[in-house]
């Protein structure tokens, strides 16, 4: 390690260059706060890093980066491909200020047809492929998956209930009554016939849609010829459901079986990359990304960096189509092939259907960026207007809005949504399950106190106070400038008291929003410490903006509450007893009918069930008596 005390900029880089090898590897540049400024890779570390020590020929972005560098770290790799893969991983994990960064890196949802069960179910799946079954996707959004599953339910009558619910059914549920499920749980359909439905669903999702539709059409005609109009109508409805799926897929290529299509457009200092996903010859949707990149970087540089990061934790198809050639395209192709475990082709099509797919993606990229630029301009004006309305020193960069949701105090949750210069920042949303047992059911003050305490205690622990945050004006701040609370003077006072106890009351502006007379929108009253309550003109754009923030917080809190309540509803008391698995639970429910009846049963009655020993019967009996 060279002696680098007191050095920075080109001097520190020169000090490191002297001992660097002529090998491929990855380098990291740090500022005085310990923050990572940049992660780069090189075929030859010594040559690449020495370029930074030269005082001429650098862009303003690189010059700023060099000036702030106070130390560096290096990792030597065996090949340049390894260096590229490591670089992409580190960029996603460390999010360096001067690199091209993906903003929305949420994993893609898939459709899962479960395996290892007599009656496979169809589900939305996100994350590691740990469950046995067949995966289809990726889909661009959860909404696209939901629409597809709904249509497939109507077409193939597959179950969507969890295994635990399936095992405890004693009669068909409502989905069977409305012809959305064939009820394999209660043997309304034989295992053999249900397996046929599953096979048809697999064939459709695997791209054999026409053969499946032909089969259903033939069955419909045969039923009609036999004057079995009831079954003919069922086949007709199933065909309509499949047509509905395909109508939402838009463009479906004839010559492209499996590909991802990337198109980039730059305008107004911003970048949009539109990605379309094609699998089994079907369009599974598209998603627009707005990567953070310096305005001095051209489309080839941004798209190349984006591509390397995009597949860091996602499966790569055999074909990747681009709107233009990227830097180090052959190296990126080799890295993607290594990561995927199969040959990947990366190309810029010049003619034919592939060219049309890229042009379609490019059109969508232009339109999406145009909308984002308009929204960003409008958002900036609204934030400045909010600052003027509420007497803030500057336009807020981060606003947090809190709301609670519960039914008579049960399944209580708190929700926090976040907004900034580019709109809602959904990867910053947080939910809080209310834990305290001391809170009286329905005590909104107590719930808000717990949420605020937990939120800001963790914020201080992880990021320190705003003065201690790493100086990075381009990064989205961790600390809010403003918090909006659903409530009046009492809620604002309670929040100020909590922040005061933590010694941070002067760091955040708290604003309360109380619903107007008769809870009418547009007549809200606003509360701040040291000010009289006030209202805003009904047509004030700032009022509309605050209403949108409040409504989004309300939507998020209610959605979180409903999810928790639904989970609580399907939970069976028998699941809490050690030693009671699906088989014993099914036997108990089949005999007694409900968990409540099981709880009232005597030990002798429990022992009558196959698989329930005396010891297990006493364990069940004691479990309910101890409650």
Swiss-Prot record:
A molecular function (GO) term: DNA binding
SMART domains, sorted: GIYc, HhH1
Domain of life according to the entry: Bacteria
Cell compartments where the protein resides: Cytoplasm
SUPFAM superfamilies xrefs: C-terminal UvrC-binding domain of UvrB, GIY-YIG endonuclease, RuvA domain 2-like
Domain annotation GIY-YIG: ranges: 22-100
Domain UVR: residue ranges: 210-245
Gene Ontology CC, one term: cytoplasm
Keyword DNA damage on entry: yes
Family matches, as InterPro entries: GIY-YIG_endonuc, GIY-YIG_endonuc_sf, GIY-YIG_UvrC_Cho, Hlx-hairpin-Hlx_DNA-bd_motif, RuvA_2-like, UVR_dom, UVR_dom_sf, UvrABC_protein_C
Intrachain disulfide bonds: none
Signal peptide range: none
Keywords: Cytoplasm, DNA damage, DNA excision, DNA repair, Excision nuclease, SOS response
GO biological process terms, semicolon-separated: nucleotide-excision repair; SOS response
Quaternary state and interactors: Interacts with UvrB in an incision complex.
Family matches, as PANTHER family: UVRABC SYSTEM PROTEIN C, UVRC/OXIDOREDUCTASE
Family assignment from sequence similarity: Belongs to the UvrC family.
Listed HAMAP family: UvrC
Function noted in UniProt: The UvrABC repair system catalyzes the recognition and processing of DNA lesions. UvrC both incises the 5' and 3' sides of the lesion. The N-terminal half is responsible for the 3' incision and the C-terminal half is responsible for the 5' incision.
Name recorded for this polypeptide: UvrABC system protein C
């Amino acid at each position: 390690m060279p002696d680098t005390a007191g050095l920075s900029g080109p001097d520190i880089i020169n000090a490191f260059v002297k001992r660097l090898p002529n090998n491929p590897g990855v380098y990291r540049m740090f500022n005085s706060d310990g923050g990572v400024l940049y992660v780069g890779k090189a075929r030859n570390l010594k040559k690449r890093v020495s370029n930074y020590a030269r005082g001429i020929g650098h862009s303003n972005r690189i010059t700023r980066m060099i000036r702030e560098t106070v130390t560096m770290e290096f990792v030597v790799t065996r090949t340049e491909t390894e260096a590229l893969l490591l670089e992409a991983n580190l960029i996603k994990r460390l999010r360096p200020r001067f690199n091209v960064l993906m903003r929305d890196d949420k994993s893609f949802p898939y459709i899962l047809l479960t395996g290892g069960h007599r009656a496979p179910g169809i589900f939305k799946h996100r994350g590691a492929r740990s469950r046995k079954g067949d995966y289809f996707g990726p889909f661009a959004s959860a909404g696209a998956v939901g629409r597809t599953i709904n249509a497939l339910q109507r077409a193939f009558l597959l179950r969507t209930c969890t295994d635990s619910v399936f095992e405890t059914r004693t009669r068909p549920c409502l989905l069977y009554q409305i012809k959305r499920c064939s009820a394999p749980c209660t043997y309304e359909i034989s295992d053999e016939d249900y397996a046929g439905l599953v096979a048809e669903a697999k064939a459709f999702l695997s791209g054999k849609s026409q053969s499946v539709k032909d089969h259903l059409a033939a069955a419909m005609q045969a039923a009609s010829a036999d004057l079995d109009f009831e079954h003919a109508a069922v086949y007709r409805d199933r065909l309509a459901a499949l047509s509905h799926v395909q109508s939402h897929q838009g463009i479906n290529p004839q010559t492209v079986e499996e590909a991802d299509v990337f198109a980039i457009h730059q305008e107004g200092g911003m970048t949009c990359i539109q990605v379309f996903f094609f699998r089994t010859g079907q369009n599974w949707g598209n998603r627009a990304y707005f990567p953070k990149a310096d305005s001095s970087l051209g489309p080839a540089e941004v798209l190349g960096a984006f591509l390397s990061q995009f597949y860091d934790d996602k499966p790569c198809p055999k074909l990747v189509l681009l709107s233009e050639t990227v830097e180090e395209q052959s190296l990126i192709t080799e890295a993607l092939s290594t990561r995927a475990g199969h040959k990947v082709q990366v190309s810029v099509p010049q003619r034919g259907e592939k060219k049309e797919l890229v042009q379609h993606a490019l059109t969508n990229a232009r339109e999406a960026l145009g909308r984002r630029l308009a929204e960003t301009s409008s958002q900036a004006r609204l934030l400045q207007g909010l600052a003027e309305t509420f007497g803030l020193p500057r336009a807020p960069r981060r606003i947090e809005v809190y709301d609670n949701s519960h039914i008579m105090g049960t399944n209580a949750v708190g929700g926090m949504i976040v907004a900034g210069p580019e709109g809602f920042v959904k990867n910053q949303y947080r939910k809080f399950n209310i834990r305290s047992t001391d809170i009286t059911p329905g005590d909104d003050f107590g719930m808000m106190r717990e949420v605020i305490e937990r939120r800001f205690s963790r914020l201080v622990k992880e990021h320190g106070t705003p003065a201690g945050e790493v100086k990075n004006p381009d990064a989205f701040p961790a600390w809010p400038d403003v918090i909006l609370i659903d409530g009046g003077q009492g809620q604002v006072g309670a929040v100020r008291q909590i922040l005061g106890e933590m010694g941070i009351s002067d760091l955040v502006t708290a604003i309360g929003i109380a619903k107007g007379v008769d809870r009418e929108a547009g007549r809200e009253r606003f509360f701040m410490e040291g000010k009289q309550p006030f209202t805003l003109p009904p047509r004030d754009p700032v009022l509309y903006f605050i209403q949108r923030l409040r409504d989004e917080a309300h939507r998020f809190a209610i959605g979180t509450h409903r999810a928790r309540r639904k989970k609580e509803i399907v939970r069976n008391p028998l699941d809490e007893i050690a030693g009671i698995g699906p088989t014993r639970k099914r036997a108990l429910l089949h005999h007694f009918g409900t968990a409540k009846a099981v709880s009232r049963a005597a030990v002798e009655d429990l022992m009558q069930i196959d698989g329930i020993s005396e010891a297990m019967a006493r364990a069940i009996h004691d479990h309910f008596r101890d409650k």
